[in-house]
Amino acid sequence: MSGAGLELDGVWRRFPSGEDEVAVLKNVTLSIAPGEMVAIVGASGSGKSTLMNILGCLDQPSVGRYRVAGQDAGCLDGDQLAALRRGHFGFIFQRYHLLPHLSALDNVAMPAVYAGMALHQRRERARALLARLGLAGKEHHRPGQLSGGQQQRVSIARALMNGGRIILADEPTGALDSHSGEEVMRILKELNAAGHTVIIVTHDPAIAAQTERVIEIRDGEILRDSGAPAREAASQATEAQPDGGPLLRERLAEAFKMAMLAMSANRLRTALTMLGIVIGIASVVSVIAIGEGSRDYVLKGIREMGTQTITVFRGKDWGDDKADGVRTFLPGDVAALEGEGYVDSVTPETAQAQRIRYRNVDVNASVIGVGRDFFRVQGMKLAEGQSFSRDDIHFQRQVVVLDKNSRRKLFGDGEAVGRVILVGMVPATVIGVVAQRDRGFGGNSLQMWMPYSTAASRLFGQQHFDRFVIRVKDGQPTKLAEKAIGALLTQRHGGKDFFTYNMDEILKTVESSSRALSLLLALVAVISLVVGGIGVMNIMLVSVTERTREIGIRMAVGARQGDVLQQFLTEAVLVCLVGGAIGVALSYGVSFVFSLFVTEWKMSLSPPVIALAVACSSLIGVLFGFLPARNAAKLNPIDALARE
């Protein structure tokens, strides 16, 4: 076995006591050679446990030097000390210190996780060690299913997992019956014969008598040392595995597994912790989905009224009393606008209310004179029949296109296309019916459309129009087109007697306002998510307190501060992710119920919203889990192991 001698030179260990300090170890100088079997004996409070803690790199001297295989432990930081524990030491405790929620196999394999051993290798080695100690077939038993002697043998196997060049046994037989105690001592002697250095801390002279060397300590000082260091034993001990530190994948897998076990062990508490996250995520997702759905509903309605369109009205602005006196909107303007390169299509519009009759049905409807491109400009589709042709406009044909309301009122379920109705005093043939729009825009009023030439000459008795609607070609900026239209009409009319209404600008304004409102609502909902995150932090702080001994055990077998931090951070993130997933599922449930009561529009649960929920869950887990995880990582292993 390669040398791993232990040397203490003038070691003092002091602890604060009020305003003073108490010396527990006083000027201890000691050497233990590789391969020795040593007993450290003393009464309770003599300092023997403190000495063992320093020997095992769980604690450091206040004064003096401690070397392990020539390496000064006082010059090492926490992670380097953890590596030293992993590579050289194996601990056997009086109360076994096995993790109750892990199987015997997993308890034994735990040190190898932090040493970076691959999963299959550490499982094979753990099985071999358990079989070597007479525990074959007990691999999947938990500590509560094993006797005291069996638990101590599991503890011994764990001490050997990374090689265990130096075995530190603290009262290894103290909690066992005589038979089990004898069995444990037999195993320790065999390990010493195989080349392991075995150091036993005990108050029992009968146990001490079975070792090669006895060191008696009283009031922090070495009272008696039975002999000089023994010669180094033959090299038969299993060497520790090369320690490159735990692989990230192995560390994450172990952290995930332990997080699942911790959640399973406290199901009610985990469920209550998740509840805050579930409500928070469901609130945020639902509010955003409602906001997005309502925005889409409004914007779709606006688009159905015509996109890429600019409407030119008579007068200076809305409410202009002189608007009705403007007579400059003429067919020549339509021709001039159609000649512009940025214009896709143009339609004039003139509207009047007229009585409509068909057989015994007599209703009042809005009759609108339009151009042949009206339905294209407005983005309207025909459910039946056809639209107006160029000849319909040119020859002032008496034809009409109905909306769905007019069709239903006049014809019910009967045929509409081809029927002749009376518009005012003018007979007109129905050539088409406009499809019902999904939105509620337009209400329940009755509308129908005629060629503007027919309406002007046969119904309205006027040649001027009320307005123009211009559809701008795709890719052309509507803002620039609006300016060009204004300049053209100002020149033709000899002045500006009109104003324009840019539908795309309105669309952008509505979209911006909707997003701002959605963001405001989401920020309100985020408050519940923050409250849930605080709940996670509180529960994780409680969990750290409850699992302090587990943290100490993990540190004793070689876990670094980063490993402990990652362990508890993973648990917090996992709780939040599971809560987030349930929250998203709940949002889908809310969306389904919402659709039962609101049929006009739907909540918009888009992939970005779901991704946002997952990101929020992870972020909450990291932010609110970091403080408890950091507290766990900063625990002193001695204090942690001593916690009941």
Curated annotation (Swiss-Prot):
Biological process, per Gene Ontology = response to antibiotic
GO cellular component terms listed in the entry, alphabetical order? plasma membrane
Q: Where does ATP bind?
A: 42-49
List UniProt keywords, sorted A-Z.
Antibiotic resistance, ATP-binding, Cell inner membrane, Cell membrane, Membrane, Nucleotide-binding, Translocase, Transmembrane, Transmembrane helix, Transport
Principal localisation? membrane
Q: Which GO terms describe its molecular function?
A: ATP binding; ATP hydrolysis activity; transmembrane transporter activity
Q: How does it sit in the membrane?
A: Multi-pass membrane protein
The ABC transporter domain sits at 6-244
Q: Which domain of life is it from?
A: Bacteria
Q: Which residues cross the membrane?
A: 271-291, 415-435, 517-537, 574-594, 609-629
Enzyme Commission number, as recorded: 7.6.2.-
Q: Where in the cell is it found?
A: Cell inner membrane
State the protein's purpose. Answer: Non-canonical ABC transporter that contains transmembrane domains (TMD), which form a pore in the inner membrane, and an ATP-binding domain (NBD), which is responsible for energy generation. Confers resistance against macrolides.
Q: How does it assemble?
A: Homodimer.
**Which family is this sequence assigned to?**
Belongs to the ABC transporter superfamily. Macrolide exporter (TC 3.A.1.122) family.
**UniProt-recorded name of the protein:** Macrolide export ATP-binding/permease protein MacB
Protein's organism: Chromobacterium violaceum (strain ATCC 12472 / DSM 30191 / JCM 1249 / CCUG 213 / NBRC 12614 / NCIMB 9131 / NCTC 9757 / MK)
